[in-house]
Regions:
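Class I S-adenosyl-L-methionine-dependent methyltransferase catalytic core
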Residues: 1-165
C-alpha cells in the first residue's frame, strides 16, 4: 500500500483544525435527534505523507474516529479507493455498514448523494481538491440543502493562475 504525497507543512495543521471543528460540531449536535452525515468528496487513500516523510491519517480516516451515522467517501482513483477500503475494513470494521466508498468523480456523484439528504439530517461536507476540480453547481446545490456545514479548501495559486492578466 502506498500513501498519497500531497500537501506540505500546512497539511497537519489543517487536519488538526478540522478535527477540532468536528469535535465542536458533534458536541453541538449531541442532544439533537438529527442523523449525522459526513461527506468527503476527495477522500484519497486514507493516508498522507508529510514533507518530513511521516505518514498521517487523512480527513477520511480521521472522520471515522467520530460518531457519524453515515459516511460518504468519493475517490476518483481506483487504487486509492481500494487502499481506503482496505484500511476502513481493517481499522474500522465496526463501521463498514455505515461507510460508502465510491469510485467516481465527485462532480458525477455528489448530486445523487445530496438528493438523498433530508431535513432530519445534518452533515459536514469536506472538499479538499488537488486543483480546481469541483463543479461550482455542486457547491451551490450543497449550500442549498441548508443542512450541511461545508469546508471547501482550494489552492489559491490555482485560482489566481486562471484570472485574466
Amino acid at each position: 500500500m502506498t500513501s498519497q504525497k500531497f500537501g506540505g507543512d500546512w497539511t497537519a495543521k489543517k487536519l488538526n483544525i478540522f478535527t477540532s471543528y468536528l469535535d465542536a460540531y458533534l458536541i453541538a449536535l449531541q442532544n439533537q435527534k438529527f442523523k449525522k452525515i459526513y461527506i468527503d468528496a476527495f477522500a484519497g487513500s486514507g493516508k498522507t505523507v508529510l514533507p518530513d516523510g511521516s505518514a498521517v491519517d487523512g480527513s477520511a480516516l480521521l472522520s471515522l474516529q467520530y460518531n457519524f451515522d453515515e459516511y460518504y467517501f468519493l475517490e476518483i482513483d481506483p487504487n486509492r479507493k481500494n487502499e481506503l477500503e482496505y484500511i476502513v475494513q481493517n481499522r474500522f470494521s465496526e463501521k463498514t455498514n455505515k461507510v460508502h466508498i465510491i469510485n467516481d468523480n465527485c462532480n458525477n456523484r455528489l448530486g445523487s448523494i445530496l438528493k438523498k439528504l433530508t431535513v432530519y439530517q445534518r452533515g459536514v461536507m469536506f472538499l479538499d481538491p488537488y486543483a480546481l476540480e469541483l463543479d461550482w453547481s455542486i457547491l451551490s446545490d450543497a449550500s442549498k440543502t441548508g443542512i450541511l456545514d461545508i469546508w471547501y479548501l482550494f489552492p489559491v495559486n490555482a485560482l489566481t493562475r486562471n484570472l485574466p492578466k
